[in-house]
């Protein structure tokens, strides 16, 4: 466990179910603290990440992990496409004798697996290196894989999201709306976020959005090598929520 336990300081849980050992290290971010794996109706679920629309998926969900099992039981593996977030998901469906592994669209969370004679699935590459001596595979972005639990054969491969690359936009209105939605849905449920703010465009756009929607945040800037005129202008807008940290030349 030493290769992976630091990924989840809030809880360590080990469960043996249907002759499979499940070990999960929890970093609690969203909703109530839910100890994984979640096992319901002979289906075991472990995931790493955040589901932003979990209340829309399942209004009674105590935490985002509950929405995964809910949508899977309702719609099957294709239902995972309804999830909006940053995650990797592992489902053991003992009713259908299947293992489902899913990444989000952009593979924001790591996941490595080996499904030969033994089943090894890990969010840390180093754990697979030790256990399987490099005979492992990383899941790809935008990928849902379905394996036979007994034969380990790949039964089905789906894309998480079908992109339409035909250009239909004539202005930036929809982009701005999508950007603001992306920022706001990532705002923490219970905590005030710290936002590192440079004089550049990326962090500046995030700060502008949070300020526009009155989302309380602590903005921290390190002036070294930054455009001070820009930072001072941002300080005027953000006021006491914007702090400077001065570092020495060392």
Regions found by a protein language model. Give the residues of each.
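Cysteine-centered catalytic environments shared across enzyme families
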Residues: 1-250
């Amino acid at each position: 466990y030493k290769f992976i336990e630091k990924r989840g300081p809030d809880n360590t849980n080990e469960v043996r179910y249907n002759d499979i050992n499940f070990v999960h290290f929890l970093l609690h971010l969203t909703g109530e603290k839910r100890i994984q794996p979640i096992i319901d109706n002979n289906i075991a679920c472990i995931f790493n990440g955040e589901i932003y629309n979990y209340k829309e998926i399942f209004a009674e969900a105590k935490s985002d992990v509950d929405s995964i099992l809910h949508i899977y039981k309702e719609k099957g593996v294709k239902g995972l496409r309804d999830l909006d977030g940053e995650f990797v998901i592992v489902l053991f469906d003992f009713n259908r004798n299947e293992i489902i592994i899913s990444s989000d669209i952009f593979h924001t969370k790591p996941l490595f697996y080996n499904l030969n004679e033994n089943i090894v699935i890990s969010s840390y590459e180093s754990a697979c290196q030790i256990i399987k001596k490099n005979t492992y595979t990383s899941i790809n972005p935008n990928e849902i894989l379905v394996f036979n639990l007994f034969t380990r054969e790949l039964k089905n491969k789906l894309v998480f999201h079908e992109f339409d690359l035909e250009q239909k936009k004539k202005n930036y209105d929809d982009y701005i709306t999508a950007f603001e939605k992306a920022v706001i849905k990532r705002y923490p449920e219970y905590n005030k976020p710290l936002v590192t703010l440079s004089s550049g465009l990326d962090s500046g756009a995030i700060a502008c959005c949070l300020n526009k929607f009155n989302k309380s945040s602590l903005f921290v800037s390190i002036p070294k090598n930054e455009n001070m005129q820009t930072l001072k202008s941002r300080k005027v807008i953000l006021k006491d929520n914007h702090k400077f940290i001065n570092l020495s030349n060392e």
